[in-house]
């Protein structure tokens, strides 16, 4: 996929609809076809936030492509002692071929990308989680064959996952509904970006009514009510978000063949019930596996593989 060769992925808005579809197609191919990088490459993981799926799936993806991985814990690098991001970026570019960053501020990610002359991948920020949404779209595509025209409903906190879902669905030609409590809506700038991508051809609905949002949806999605860094707010958020739990009752309002997604980790009994996450409509484990395949496709496209 020559179009992404050497490029950053800081946001799903960096992709065109065609590039998104080509990435999903390549991810599907890589489930049964082996590719190798054109020469031995090194991926650096610079993660300031805890990670299970993102860390392991990026590591395995790079190994399966024939590359190597260095796990750069910020706490044992000079970043933790105040070395400027721009200095760190200009050093790491001389050792690495690609850098995946998981951090709090989107601006820190953007600064790395500005100063490092190697590709930089957003492995999660407080604003966006693009790699997760690539896996979500691949999962929906596997379940419904075609995703254009489908409706995805997200219920819960208008966080980084909700932001990236709006962009991803707009690129994929899907309708997206975001149901949040008042005051917890997605980032307004990302909403505007998604609306510009959709260009009136698909629906982007923001509502405080989870039942309205769920009616007729083919994909029902949720995430934790308090993201990393918001743990102190968890007790205050619980009563506010309780009406936004994905339960069997809420799921019954969706299409009969609707699937349920959750980016994990899940707090059973909070944003989703045990019955739903373990139920017949849950595709959560397929979704988690697909992190490996979409990130392998992304690395192969950015670094070049054959």
From Swiss-Prot:
Residue positions binding L-ornithine: 160, 223, 227-228
Keywords: Amino-acid biosynthesis, Arginine biosynthesis, Cytoplasm, Transferase
GO molecular function: amino acid binding; ornithine carbamoyltransferase activity
InterPro entries for the chain: Asp/Orn_carbamoyltranf_P-bd, Asp/Orn_carbamoylTrfase, Asp/Orn_carbamoylTrfase_sf, Asp_carbamoyltransf_Asp/Orn-bd, Orn/put_carbamltrans, OTCase_ArgI
Catalytic activity: carbamoyl phosphate + L-ornithine = L-citrulline + phosphate + H(+)
Binding sites annotated in the UniProt record for carbamoyl phosphate: 51-54, 78, 102, 129-132, 263-264, 291
Known EC number: 2.1.3.3
Top-level taxon of origin: Bacteria
Major localization class: cytoplasm
Compartment(s) of residence: Cytoplasm
Biological processes annotated in GO: arginine biosynthetic process via ornithine; citrulline biosynthetic process; L-arginine biosynthetic process
Pathways per UniProt: Amino-acid biosynthesis; L-arginine biosynthesis; L-arginine from L-ornithine and carbamoyl phosphate: step 1/3
Enzyme class: transferase
GO cellular component, one term: cytoplasm
Family statement drawn from the similarity comment of this UniProt entry: Belongs to the aspartate/ornithine carbamoyltransferase superfamily. OTCase family.
Function according to Swiss-Prot or TrEMBL: Reversibly catalyzes the transfer of the carbamoyl group from carbamoyl phosphate (CP) to the N(epsilon) atom of ornithine (ORN) to produce L-citrulline.
HAMAP family registered for this protein in UniProt: OTCase (MF_01109)
Name of this protein: Ornithine carbamoyltransferase
Organism of this sequence: Trichormus variabilis (strain ATCC 29413 / PCC 7937)
């Amino acid at each position: 996929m020559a179009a992404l060769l050497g490029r950053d992925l800081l946001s799903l808005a960096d992709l065109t609809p065609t590039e998104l579809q080509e990435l999903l197609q390549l991810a599907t191919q890589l489930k049964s076809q082996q590719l190798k990088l054109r020469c031995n490459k090194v991926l650096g993981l610079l993660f300031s936030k805890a990670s299970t799926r993102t860390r392991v799936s990026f590591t395995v993806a790079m190994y399966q492509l024939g590359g190597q991985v260095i796990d750069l814990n910020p706490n044992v690098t000079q970043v933790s002692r105040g070395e400027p991001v721009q200095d760190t970026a200009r050093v790491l570019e001389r050792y690495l071929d690609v850098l995946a960053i998981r951090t709090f501020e989107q601006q820190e990610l953007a600064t790395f990308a500005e100063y490092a002359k190697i590709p930089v991948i957003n492995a999660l920020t407080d604003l966006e989680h693009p790699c997760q949404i690539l896996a979500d779209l691949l999962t929906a595509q596997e379940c419904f064959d075609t995703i254009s025209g489908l409706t995805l409903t997200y219920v819960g906190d208008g966080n980084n996952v909700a932001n990236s879902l709006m962009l991803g669905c707009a690129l994929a030609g899907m309708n997206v509904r975001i149901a949040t409590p008042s005051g917890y809506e997605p980032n307004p700038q990302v909403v505007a970006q998604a609306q510009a991508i959709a260009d009136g051809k698909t629906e982007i609905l923001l509502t405080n009514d989870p039942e309205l949002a769920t009616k007729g949806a083919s994909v029902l999605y949720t995430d934790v009510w308090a993201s990393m860094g918001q743990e102190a707010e968890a007790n205050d958020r619980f009563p506010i978000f309780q009406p936004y739990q994905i339960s069997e009752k809420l799921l019954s309002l969706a299409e009969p063949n609707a699937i349920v997604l959750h980016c994990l980790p899940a707090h059973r009994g909070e944003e989703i019930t045990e019955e739903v996450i373990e139920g017949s409509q849950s595709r959560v484990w397929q979704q988690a596996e697909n992190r490996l395949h979409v990130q392998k496709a992304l690395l192969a496209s950015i670094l070049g593989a054959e």
